[in-house]
């Protein structure tokens, strides 16, 4: 997964702090299957390639020089992307009976950063801006189309 790609999240690994305070971590953070299908359909109709699968919600997004990073572990476990909000949104929506899904615009890959340094991270790229616009378009199409 690279900057400018899109990811449709099926579910989120709950490595954040907030969702753990709402319900036990054994409670799954999942998207609504019908909305996943609608997002996929909107992407296919528009000829847009999207990655799909699990995402990692973590409040420690960047590697730390002392603690290191568990991102290689999650990559081996087939996690597609790292972000900071989806698990909490999925849990809260599920608890309140609200359908939910997420399409993410990828702005970089922390596994590609030299030695864990984020010095070369640059989300201000045309490919990322285009992905954000496309993700909004897909979400609107999935909800209204």
Regions found by a protein language model. Give the residues of each.
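Glycine-rich phosphate- or other oxyanion-binding loops that anchor nucleotides, phosphorylated ligands
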Residues: 1-145
